[in-house]
Protein backbone atom coordinates (compact mmCIF):
# COMPACT_ATOMS: atom_id res chain seq x y z
CA UNK A 1 0.00 0.00 0.00
CA UNK A 2 1.33 3.40 -0.98
CA UNK A 3 1.01 6.30 1.45
CA UNK A 4 0.64 9.66 -0.30
CA UNK A 5 -0.17 13.24 0.62
CA UNK A 6 -2.65 13.57 -2.23
CA UNK A 7 -4.68 10.76 -3.81
CA UNK A 8 -6.14 12.67 -6.73
CA UNK A 9 -3.48 11.51 -9.19
CA UNK A 10 -3.61 7.93 -7.91
CA UNK A 11 -7.33 7.66 -8.60
CA UNK A 12 -6.68 7.93 -12.33
CA UNK A 13 -4.11 5.13 -12.47
CA UNK A 14 -6.72 2.41 -13.08
CA UNK A 15 -10.37 2.53 -14.08
CA UNK A 16 -11.54 0.47 -11.08
CA UNK A 17 -9.95 2.68 -8.41
CA UNK A 18 -12.43 3.98 -5.84
CA UNK A 19 -11.97 6.69 -3.23
CA UNK A 20 -13.36 5.72 0.20
CA UNK A 21 -13.23 7.23 3.70
CA UNK A 22 -12.79 4.85 6.61
CA UNK A 23 -12.20 5.89 10.22
CA UNK A 24 -11.25 9.44 9.20
CA UNK A 25 -8.66 8.32 6.65
CA UNK A 26 -8.93 8.44 2.89
CA UNK A 27 -8.13 5.30 0.91
CA UNK A 28 -7.97 4.21 -2.71
CA UNK A 29 -9.26 0.65 -3.11
CA UNK A 30 -9.21 -1.51 -6.21
CA UNK A 31 -10.72 -4.99 -6.12
CA UNK A 32 -9.52 -6.10 -9.55
CA UNK A 33 -5.91 -4.85 -9.17
CA UNK A 34 -5.03 -4.62 -5.46
CA UNK A 35 -1.57 -3.22 -6.20
CA UNK A 36 -3.20 0.20 -6.62
CA UNK A 37 -4.23 0.42 -2.96
CA UNK A 38 -3.20 3.67 -1.29
CA UNK A 39 -3.78 5.66 1.87
CA UNK A 40 -3.58 9.39 2.46
CA UNK A 41 -1.38 10.48 5.33
Curated annotation (Swiss-Prot):
InterPro entries noted in UniProt: Ribosomal_bL36 (IPR000473), Ribosomal_bL36_sp (IPR035977), Ribosomal_L36_bact (IPR047621)
Gene expressing this chain: rpmJ
Single GO MF descriptor: structural constituent of ribosome
GO BP, sorted A to Z: translation
Organism (species): Brucella anthropi (strain ATCC 49188 / DSM 6882 / CCUG 24695 / JCM 21032 / LMG 3331 / NBRC 15819 / NCTC 12168 / Alc 37) (Ochrobactrum anthropi)
SUPFAM superfamilies with a match to the protein in the record: Ribosomal protein L36 (SSF57840)
Keyword Ribosomal protein: yes
Recorded family membership: Belongs to the bacterial ribosomal protein bL36 family.
Keywords annotated in UniProt: Ribonucleoprotein, Ribosomal protein
Record GO cellular component, one term: ribosome
Listed Pfam families: Ribosomal_L36
Protein name as it appears in the record: Large ribosomal subunit protein bL36
